[in-house]
Amino acid sequence: MLAVFQAWAYGVILYLIYLLLIWLWKEKIDTVLVGLFFGTLTAAQFIANKLVDYGIGVAPAGTVIFMTNVAVLDAMAIFYGRQFAMRAVRLGFFFQAAVAFAAWAAAQLPPPAWFAERAAVVDSVIAPSARIALASLAAYLISSTVDVYIVTKWPRLHILARVYSSSLISQVVDTAVFISLAFGPEAQIILGQILVKWAQIPLEALLIYGVRRYVSTLRTK
C-alpha cells in the first residue's frame, strides 16, 4: 500500500508544477494546457514500460503522469469546449503514432559493436511491439473521446461531478481496451489497473480548480 501513497505524493508534485507553469503563463493558459497534454502523453508512453505493484493492483509506472494527462484533457474540455479538446485528442493520436514509429525506427538502426548489449536493453524500453503500440493507440483514442463527451455532456452538474464521473468511466474503457487488445481479456490485470487509476482521480481537483481560478480572472478583465 505504501506505493499508493507515494503515487499520490508524486501526483501532487506534478500538479503543483503544472499550476506553477499556468501561473507563469496565465495569459496563455490554453497554450500551456496543450503543451502539458502532449508532454504528459509522451512521458506516460515511455514510463509505461516499468510495472509497479501499488498494493491495490499492478499498473505501469506511467499511470500517475497519465492520470494528470486525463485531468489536463478535462480542463481543456471544461474551460475551452468540446471541439477544442477533441482537436487536441485527434492531434495527440497522430502524435503518439509518430512517436511510436520514431521509437521503432530508432530500434532498427545498427548500434556500434561496443554498445550492442546496452542497445538491446534500450530498444526493449523505447520500442514497444506492434500489438502493444496499436492497443495503446486504440485505447487512447476511444477513452479520450469518451472522457471529453461525458465531461461536457452535462454542464449544469457540479464541476467535480463532471470531472470525476468522466475519469472513472473513461479509465475503465481505457484499461479494458488496452489490456484486451495487448494481452487478452485478463480480468485480474484489468481490475488492478482500474483501481490504481481510480486512486489518482481525486487529485484532479487540484488542477481543475487552479485552472478555473485563472480562467475566471482572465474572463473578468
Model-derived regions, located:
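Alpha-helical transmembrane segments and their cytosolic interface
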Residues: 1-10, 18, 161, 170-221
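Short alpha-helical transmembrane interface motifs in multi-pass membrane proteins
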Residues: 54-58, 130-136, 161-162, 189-192
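Hydrophobic transmembrane alpha-helices
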Residues: 1-76
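Transmembrane alpha-helical segments of multi-pass membrane transport proteins and ion-pumping complexes
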Residues: 15, 45-46, 70, 74, ...
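Internal alpha-helical transmembrane segments of multi-pass membrane proteins
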Residues: 128-133, 153-172, 218-221
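Membrane-interface interhelical connector segments
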Residues: 105-130
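Transmembrane alpha-helix boundary signature
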Residues: 46-56, 79, 101-114
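Membrane-interface alpha-helices at helix entry/exit sites of multi-pass transporters
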Residues: 83-91, 161-164
